[in-house]
């Protein structure tokens, strides 16, 4: 059996890593192998389709990488076990199947375009075209497969550090259309860019560390004035601990009713998740209020052990209150009880962290720090004068205002 037919048989029998056959490049390559006995038009169509994909992905000279890297982002029993550091608990026959699959992936990755063309049943009919057909270069495999000798240590270490499935490729997600969707270009903000609010950030960081380490931790409400860095803190923390198995999923506040669906999708995953709800507030009779209350109180749709809820709000009390809410009527003798019920939701977050607008000195310290980070060549006096004028035009001082001012210096 030549290498091409052997490869076709091995790919046909993939088991643990069978999911890679749904990925575009391996799927197109397999379809090419299946067309080896078909008419020239069908074979050449499959060949051209694969070459087109490789060119579009910048892999025309990295065929081996394009094939093997799909295994790094596959979601299977071995990848999940390795992510949790429990691959040693897998049955021996599963481990053996993983090794066989890895051999199959490597066999496919090493095949050259010349070998495939030579194996075509009707090669004589296209011999005049073969010299001008595009050819791929094999190149090197993905690092975990480079020099594979039967040991799964490199692959296990990769999953342990990066996670499995789409959670290995992406670190930030959003709940949309009833499913978890990756965020292709997340905010890259990190902890080193912050100035001020050290006490508030340390509270959230310490709570997150306890969560990652499996210690006692709390759902967290970050509340206070707009533009003070509440959302940025959550995003920066998610970036800071991504290599510790932490992922962030943003849940739009108008989809809180979907919380049980989200729980079902992440509960069994060997990763930690922050469920992020931004700009949280409710109107009376809001069904989402009841859903979140049940989650925080530990109802049937309670959050799993591998998830925490981090919410931000401009309000300490999350249910908007109107004058009419304070008006007693004959029909409603429990107005006070209803008000207390509405105002108590925020108390169900175990950790509440307050962000207030900075003082003038704190505001200017933030400006100076950001200006230094960006390499601005201005004196503190010049920065202070410009920043204060900018803040007046923006309705007040805040970290957001400070950042916008520094950015405006480059416009």
Segments from the language model and where they lie:
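Pre-Walker A adenine-sensing motif
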Residues: 198-213
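Phosphate-binding P-loop
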Residues: 182-185, 209-217
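Conserved AAA+ ATPase "SRH/arginine-finger" region at the nucleotide-binding site
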Residues: 330-343, 350-364
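Walker A/P-loop nucleotide-binding motif
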Residues: 197, 214-234
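C-terminal alpha-helical "lid" subdomain
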Residues: 352, 356-411
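AAA+ P-loop ATPase mechanoenzymes
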Residues: 1-195, 199
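Conserved catalytic/switch belt of AAA+ P-loop NTPases
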Residues: 267-268, 283-331, 337
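AAA+/P-loop NTPase substrate/partner-engagement loops
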Residues: 240-273, 281-285
């Amino acid at each position: 059996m030549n290498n091409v037919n052997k490869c076709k048989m091995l790919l046909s029998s993939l088991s643990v890593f069978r999911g890679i056959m749904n990925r575009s490049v391996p799927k197109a390559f397999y379809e090419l192998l299946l067309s080896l006995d078909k008419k020239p038009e069908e074979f050449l169509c499959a060949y051209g389709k694969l070459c087109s994909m490789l060119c579009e992905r910048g892999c025309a000279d990295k065929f081996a990488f394009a094939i093997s890297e799909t295994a790094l982002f596959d979601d299977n029993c071995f990848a999940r076990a390795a992510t949790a550091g429990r691959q040693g608990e897998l049955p021996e026959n599963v481990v053996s199947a993983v090794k066989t699959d890895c051999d199959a992936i490597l066999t496919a990755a090493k095949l050259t375009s010349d070998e495939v063309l030579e194996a075509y049943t009707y090669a004589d009919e296209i011999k005049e075209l073969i010299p001008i057909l595009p050819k791929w270069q094999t190149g090197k495999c993905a690092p975990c497969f480079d020099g594979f000798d039967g040991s799964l240590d490199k692959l296990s270490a990769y999953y342990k550090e990066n996670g499995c499935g789409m959670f290995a490729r992406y670190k930030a997600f959003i709940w949309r259309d009833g499913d978890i969707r990756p965020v292709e270009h997340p905010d890259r903000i990190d902890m080193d860019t912050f100035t001020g609010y050290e006490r508030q950030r340390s509270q959230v960081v310490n709570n997150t560390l306890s969560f990652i380490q499996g210690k006692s931790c709390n759902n967290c409400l970050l509340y206070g004035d707009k533009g003070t860095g509440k959302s940025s803190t959550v995003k920066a923390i998610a970036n800071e601990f991504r290599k510790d198995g932490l992922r962030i999923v943003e849940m739009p506040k108008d989809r809180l009713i979907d919380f049980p669906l989200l729980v079902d999708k992440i509960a069994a995953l060997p990763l930690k998740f922050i469920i992020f709800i931004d700009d949280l507030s409710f109107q009376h009779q809001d069904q989402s209020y009841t859903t979140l209350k049940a989650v925080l109180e530990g109802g049937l749709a309670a959050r799993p052990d591998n998830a925490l809820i981090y919410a931000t709000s401009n309000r300490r009390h999350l249910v908007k209150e109107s004058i009419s809410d304070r008006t007693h009527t004959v029909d409603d003798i429990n107005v006070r009880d209803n008000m207390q019920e509405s105002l108590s939701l925020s108390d169900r977050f175990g950790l509440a962290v307050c962000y207030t607008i900075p003082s003038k000195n704190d505001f200017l310290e933030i400006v100076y720090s950001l200006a230094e980070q960006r390499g601005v060549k201005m004196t503190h006096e010049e920065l202070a004068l410009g920043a204060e004028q900018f803040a007046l035009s923006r309705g007040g001082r805040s970290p957001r205002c400070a950042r916008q001012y520094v950015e405006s210096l480059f416009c």
